[in-house]
Amino acid sequence: RNFAIGAADDQAKRAYDVLYRATEAGLAVARPGATCCDLFAAMRAVIATFDPGTGEVGRLGHGLGMQLTEWPSHAPFDNTVLRENMVITLEPSLGYGDGMIMVHEENIVVGDGPPRLLSARAPRDLPIIG
């Protein structure tokens, strides 16, 4: 989860908004029959609205199981087909400001219909503490 302490500048708020919307795009695609590269493309399209050059990462999520990071990878090269009951992460990220990076993560179970979140969804707006 992401939080700002005291205050958040406009760039941080915008980065958080883009990553929240990228996660929403991933949630909309995460259904049986979709591929990991479909997930990547959906999230990456939203990240590109922030800055077309940002988000050049190897992947935007992965499988979750006995290891912290497992197959499959949500990347343009992974054609793994999602199946019901797969447990995966959605992890869109982007660089912003002067060397800053923000990563948003939701862990989900792929289901017949909307995926099931394994924890409460992150707040819509960047939480500010203090």
Name each model feature, range by range.
Residues 1-130:
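Active-site neighborhoods and metal-handling regions in enzymes and metal-associated proteins
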